Amino acid sequence: MANPFKDQSKFMKACGQTVNERNEAQYKLYCDLIDEEFNDEFKLALANNDRVEQLDALIDILVVTIGAIHSGGFDAEGAWKEVMSTNFAKIDKETGKVRKREDGKVLKPIGWVAPNLKSFVK
């Protein structure tokens, strides 16, 4: 199975970029690219109902978001596991389902604890 974090790390190294260490200029670049991909590419693809371009923009958003995570000096995989662990805690053990609002947003159950990401920030 693909590992997007490792794939992007390999690509960034080939581009001469730093990975898993804080690089403010590079971090800003990737944050700007997230904005560009979403506001320019994805929204245009939605407006045009172009599903191929929507997919391209969504994958590009993932790529530049992972680039930002690597450039921010964050532990991407550790943070991912922590966030997903807390997301899975939203699943009711008896029903195997989550509770949702009318619009589909998943609700946090009573006693839910937010992810502790402090240890993943370098």
Q: Model-predicted segments: where are they?
A:
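Flexible "arm" and connector segments at domain edges
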Residues: 1-58, 62-122
